[in-house]
Amino acid sequence: MAFSWQEQIKPAGTQDIQCDIEYLDKSYIHVYLDGAETTGYTWTSATNIRLNTALAASTTVLLIRKTEREYLYIEFASGSPFIEVNVDSQNTQFLHLAQELVEGRAIPGFYGTISMNGYRITDLANPINAQDAATKAYVDTADTLLGQRIDAEHSGWVSAVHAEAVTRKAADDALSMRTSALENTFISGVETVSYPWSAVLTAATDEVTPGLAFTKAVVEINGVGQIRGYSFEIVDNTILFAEVLPAGTVVAARLGADVTAGDGFATQASVDYLANSLGDLAYLDKAAAVSDATSTGDVVAKLNALLAALRTSGVLAT
């Protein structure tokens, strides 16, 4: 039980406060509302304080006794009679000062912000509640743990960045290789896009739809290259063949790859097909029946002329 102070939480609308603290003079009682001292009140009796304005909200009301310590409440030297009541009052002043000192209310600022005036608070226990004071050892330990956590998270971040960089590099390298392969589709180095696709026909048909958007392709039937405009055509993302292909036929295509390039360029597919055809021609001993198609003219025109000669000689059936 405290002798020099009392604290209560009062609800909104409260105006009268009961003072249960013993005092020698009403001026020794100080009133604090939520930590701020107020003088907006009057005494209606020896134990009741009435606020000038009722509390607008729930408020912590603190009453503190601050007994005068700079002069004696009773001064016999000034003529106060040396009687029982005066002696008791004088001793009561000493008692109240001792209570306030022991309870800490005699220390200026104890009920508010505390100033240690440059001195330390020593022999503190470790904090438990959120508003407890922390010791240097506690703070240093927490700082060390925080540093370790930061280092660990940084290390993890560095590892993650490195792993992502490795993954990205692998993807970039793969993309670079694929891009180079696609660029090399043409002898001239003209870029194109090529998607390999193949299927084994489950039923006889004269058309296949790969399911991709394309307007050009290099097509093979059972490993034999086909000529666009002769043995197949492309319409609405579908390969249309000149004749019905039986079930079991293997159809392979590089979708998006040019069969002819024009403007003096030939595709790798065209050259490969030409080489295969010339090999067939020599094997069939029909080279003499094929006109010489080499000159400085347009490559595509000469290639078409050569293909026409191959068909005439019987090397090509279509």
UniProtKB/Swiss-Prot annotation:
| Compartments where found | Virion
What GO cellular-component annotations does this UniProt entry give?
Answer: virus tail
What are the protein's UniProt keywords?
A: Viral tail protein, Virion
Q: What InterPro entries does this protein map onto?
A: Phage_T7_tail_fibre-like_N
- Presence of keyword Membrane: no
What top-level branch of life does the organism fall under? Viruses
UniProt entry tagged with the keyword Nucleus: no
Q: Briefly, what is this protein's role?
A: Anchors indirectly the receptor binding (RBP) protein (depolymerase) to the virion.
Name of this chain's protein: Anchor protein
Question: What high-level taxonomic lineage is stated for the organism?
Answer: Viruses, Duplodnaviria, Heunggongvirae, Uroviricota, Caudoviricetes
